[in-house]
Design a protein with these regions (language model features):
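Catalytic-loop motifs flanking and including active-site residues across diverse enzymes
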Residues: 61, 87, 114-118, 156-159
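Divalent-cation-assisted or electrostatically stabilized phosphate/pyrophosphate-binding catalytic cores
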Residues: 10-17, 104-123, 183-200
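Acidic/His-rich, divalent-metal-binding segments that scaffold phosphate/diphosphate chemistry
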Residues: 1-107
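Histidine/acidic-rich helix-loop-helix segments that form or flank divalent-metal centers
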Residues: 87, 100, 104-107, 129-185
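An amphipathic alpha-helix signature
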Residues: 66, 85, 115-119, 123, ...
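Alpha-helix termini
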Residues: 74-78, 127-132
């Protein structure tokens, strides 16, 4: 990690420590067994010119989604296993974005159906999870798949996860819009939209 980024790794390790369920332990050990993928995950941007489109952006976005999804699930009194599944989904929901670098050696963000590539990278732990607990596998797979509003099966915990993803994206977009603006600016244009904020006092 670059200078000043050690707190990101600390946050990452803290989140892994919250995953207690035996059936989810493979998602912790995944990183130790896939060093090339882990290095790509730490450094890549989360998008091309949208949210978190900078070095370490994918890691930052994944941490934010995992933290928001887990804390909201706990606050809304979901079961311990559902809270942990939401956390795992937050950490891994965009892992498909590293595929071009880790598997093909292509540097720079590549657009595409990254949700589908999630399953290519996570085939091993997902297979083991399917054997150990099919319902848990089905829930996590639903979160890792492309969003489908009218899917026949719906999970309340998935809505919490999807909202966490949306909130992380929107907050970063707002930060980037104001990044080169004076601290006192309360609004600015982004495309055809007016973006507003309350500046720090």
């Amino acid at each position: 990690l670059g200078k000043g980024r050690l707190p990101l790794l600390t946050r990452f390790i803290r989140l892994l420590g919250l995953i207690k369920a035996p059936i989810l332990q493979l998602f912790i050990s995944y990183w130790g067994m896939h060093i090339k993928q882990f290095e790509a995950f730490l450094t890549m941007p989360a998008s091309y010119q949208d949210h978190h489109a900078y070095t370490h952006g994918l890691l930052i976005h994944s941490l934010e989604v995992a933290e928001l999804a887990y804390s909201n699930a706990v606050r809304l009194q979901h079961s311990s296993i559902e809270c942990q599944v939401a956390l795992v989904a937050g950490l891994f929901h965009d892992i498909g974005k590293i595929y071009s670098l880790s598997e093909a050696g292509i540097y720079g963000y590549q657009t595409g159906a990254h949700e589908c590539l999630n399953f290519a990278l996570l085939a091993e732990p997902l297979q083991q999870l399917a054997i150990a607990d099919w319902d848990c596998h089905r829930m996590l797979s639903s979160m890792l798949a492309p969003y489908a509003r009218y899917r026949s099966e719906q999970y309340a915990i998935e809505a919490i996860f999807r909202n966490a993803d949306h909130n992380s994206c929107q907050s970063d977009r707002a930060r980037q819009v104001f990044a080169d603006k004076p601290a006192h600016y309360r609004f600015t244009k982004a495309g055809n939209q007016m973006v507003r904020r309350l500046p720090s006092s």
